[in-house]
């Protein structure tokens, strides 16, 4: 049975995620006029594009909302963001730049917390401003039903009656003015912006064209580092982690992470850190383009991964990147609270994040230009003396040990050479690769395993092998 209503449920309470913008303001007024009972819910997620968030519910009341509530979701969003940081749940990367999934994070928290607030008011029909072509319509659908299985969905922008009457911004503004509603004639930008405490997304309109660059965007979380007329002074910054969580910036400890994140944003924002231009695959597999800001997350991410590489072994780091990317895509699809995500989250937090304790000192310059000055911690696996090119006492291993290790490699090198000979014989290897490797005569790989030894040494080796095999057989360890 479909949970989506195609027409306005007259006489019933309809909750709407209210931003205070033109579209949702008009939706509230239109639903009231047509006989529904609109109830407005606004999430305080620390959005940088709405500094007066506490005033937004009052606007909803002016447009006819019976209930208008502000739901403080900052703490929940910060906590989910720290989990994403620990897990490396970021799958969109290109050209050395990362999108930190700040909008999908916000949707997970907003979707669940607003629907829970609605349920407290016996509101079980929910609408929001997402369009049918985007990701948010599915994200909110999933999170809404997870929070309230009885939920039904009504979106004015999927209602033919609403769209035919109020199909564009001109029609909406005229409709509001004709009925005497307050109308904030916001300056029309060349793109749309959505933000929360972790980051900002700029997309649509002019940014849909790939000949429009990052430089048409006016950042809201920091400086436009790409502008030559803006001075950016170098700055030395330290970031401290305990058990995978950031706890201090520049030596100042933060007991409350909700206070730490804005400070990280301010530091990174002074340099334009963490801005990226990405082409991505939406949930429906259509390509879209976005310009993203996340100065604080970028700063924390740099320090976190520096410690990660200094602490964990190669396979653990590889699992972090592989599973983190999988988790990032699941979050992007609105599956952050699904079992497969919880499984990955728990594993990465427990076995990767819990070991990340230490401090990283950086020199920030302009944009993503930075230098790591120092890395310290109580449990680093990095020890210079292990691989020092200088003479050291009590070395972990010596030349003879390495000769033995290299000799053991002969087994798999011979196998690899045999495969190359096989491929060459069937014509699979040609062109530049064949020119690089040279002649691949079949059977020559055996020479890798053959040793040039005297008959006496060969006889001794055979005696040792025979004795070893006999001892192993007698001990039951063969």
Swiss-Prot record:
EC nos: 6.3.4.5
Binding-site residues for L-aspartate, renumbered to this chain: 131, 135-136
InterPro entries: Arg_succ_synth_type2_subfam, Arginosuc_syn_C, Arginosuc_syn_N, Arginosuc_synth, Arginosuc_synth_CS, Arginosuc_synth_type_1_subfam, AS_cat/multimer_dom_body, AS_multimer_C_tail
Protein name: Argininosuccinate synthase
Top-level taxon of origin: Bacteria
Residues engaged in binding L-citrulline: 99, 135, 139, 192, 201, 203, 280
Pathway given in the UniProt record: Amino-acid biosynthesis; L-arginine biosynthesis; L-arginine from L-ornithine and carbamoyl phosphate: step 2/3
A biological process term (GO) from this entry: L-arginine biosynthetic process
Quaternary structure and interacting proteins, as annotated: Homotetramer.
Compartments in which it is found: Cytoplasm
Protein family (similarity comment): Belongs to the argininosuccinate synthase family. Type 2 subfamily.
Cleaved signal peptide residues: none
MF (Gene Ontology): argininosuccinate synthase activity; ATP binding; protein homodimerization activity
Keywords annotated in UniProt: Amino-acid biosynthesis, Arginine biosynthesis, ATP-binding, Cytoplasm, Ligase, Nucleotide-binding
Any matching Pfam family: Arginosuc_synth
Catalytic activity entry: L-citrulline + L-aspartate + ATP = 2-(N(omega)-L-arginino)succinate + AMP + diphosphate + H(+)
Binding site for ATP: 17-25, 43, 129, 131, 136, 194
Annotated Gene Ontology cellular component terms: cytoplasm
Keyword Nucleotide-binding: yes
